[in-house]
Amino acid sequence: MESLTLQPIARVDGTINLPGSKSVSNRALLLAALAHGKTVLTNLLDSDDVRHMLNALTALGVSYTLSADRTRCEIIGNGGPLHAEGALELFLGNAGTAMRPLAAALCLGSNDIVLTGEPRMKERPIGHLVDALRLGGAKITYLEQENYPPLRLQGGFTGGNVDVDGSVSSQFLTALLMNAPLAPEDTVIRIKGDLVSKPYIDITLNLMKTFGVEIENQHYQQFVVKGGQSYQSPGTYLVEGDASSASYFLAAAAIKGGTVKVTGIGRNSMQGDIRFADVLEKMGATICWGDDYISCTRGELNAIDMDMNHIPDAAMTIATAALFAKGTTTLRNIYNWRVKETDRLFAMATELRKVGAEVEEGHDYIRITPPEKLNFAEIATYNDHRMAMCFSLVALSDTPVTILDPKCTAKTFPDYFEQLARISQAA
């Protein structure tokens, strides 16, 4: 297996222009494909997940052109639901941001489409979404294991009253919300359980509004969506920088700054993961907010005990930053780490122990006490981009770290290690 050894980093300083947000890129691509008119997306993320969405749109007959660097995309909207001529199979890798929204969108009208992906995708639950779509009339068959992909979709979604469990993944609700305006009837979506990752729902609602569709949000408990609507192209749309990707550079500055400034997001960003900067500030770093940037300057870091349900992806970065904080850090209410690219609670606990931390892994929390000195370790990444990026922070000590399968960052940030090197000074 390929590996990358990072030598100790004495200091980080500089500016990082963030690649486009994965969450925003894939939502915007699908809405542009469903909309009337031509949409130009700029600062689109070029990554594995986005390529899976683009390949699916190609197979569904959507026409678009990409710039040479794949960050500008002109899409000719379909002006309504997407249809396949005859039976079709779409391979979506391990891209949850493609699998869930497409599973819903392709239940409109009449289709016969199979959605499948990598082995890990077949372990990521989708039953709550399928249950909700079936309540709205969709015909969906599990081809292997009940409640997991691959799925066969045969259309039939008309709207009506649907319930969806909000406690596992906000992507199920996102998929229903994006699909509902194009259904023939009104849809009322009721949330069962506590809704996780609410800020990701705000991204969805924000984008739907940009594409001309308003819905009624009743305190995140119930959503009322009028049927028979259509999405309208906004013309040109700039994809925000990826706030989750910003977390690694901001954390690096908190540990070994200097000052690092990330551009492409700012105080008015729609992504909930910008709140990660508040956590670093609470730990002792200095944060400065602009309209299109966030900067972080080193401080003495102290441990925290916090509910991280609002920033589950960026919270992973706090787990490795905790290695540099005084005291024991506890991250709570993060059960949904277990249903991501890998079981992130298990993976994080296992790898933190390798570098010498004392770790308690609970059902939905993790407690981390750093060692006096970090151990050298080979870090397994579990084909999870965030594991690779989080553990790069270990090099901000006086100990090198080896990252196995470093190219797994291609899921969201193909040149992550080059960008980290650019702002780093060797010890």
Swiss-Prot record:
The species this protein was found in: Shigella sonnei
Cellular localisation: Cytoplasm
HAMAP family documented for this protein: EPSP_synth
Upper classification of the organism: Bacteria, Pseudomonadati, Pseudomonadota, Gammaproteobacteria, Enterobacterales
Catalytic reaction equation(s): 3-phosphoshikimate + phosphoenolpyruvate = 5-O-(1-carboxyvinyl)-3-phosphoshikimate + phosphate
Chief localisation class: cytoplasm
Record-listed phosphoenolpyruvate binding positions: K22, G96, R124, Q171, R344, R386, K411
Pathway as given in its UniProt record: Metabolic intermediate biosynthesis; chorismate biosynthesis; chorismate from D-erythrose 4-phosphate and phosphoenolpyruvate: step 6/7
Example GO BP: aromatic amino acid family biosynthetic process
Residues reported in the UniProt entry to bind 3-phosphoshikimate: K22, S23, R27, S169, S170, Q171, S197, D313, N336, K340
Function: Catalyzes the transfer of the enolpyruvyl moiety of phosphoenolpyruvate (PEP) to the 5-hydroxyl of shikimate-3-phosphate (S3P) to produce enolpyruvyl shikimate-3-phosphate and inorganic phosphate.
Active site residues according to the UniProt entry: D313 (proton acceptor)
Assembly, per entry: Monomer.
GO cellular component: cytoplasm
Enzyme class: transferase
NCBIfam families assigned: aroA
Entries under InterPro entries matching the protein: Enolpyruvate_Tfrase_dom, Enolpyruvate_Tfrase_sf, EPSP_synthase, EPSP_synthase_CS, RNA3'P_cycl/enolpyr_Trfase_a/b
Family the entry assigns: Belongs to the EPSP synthase family.
Record-given protein name: 3-phosphoshikimate 1-carboxyvinyltransferase
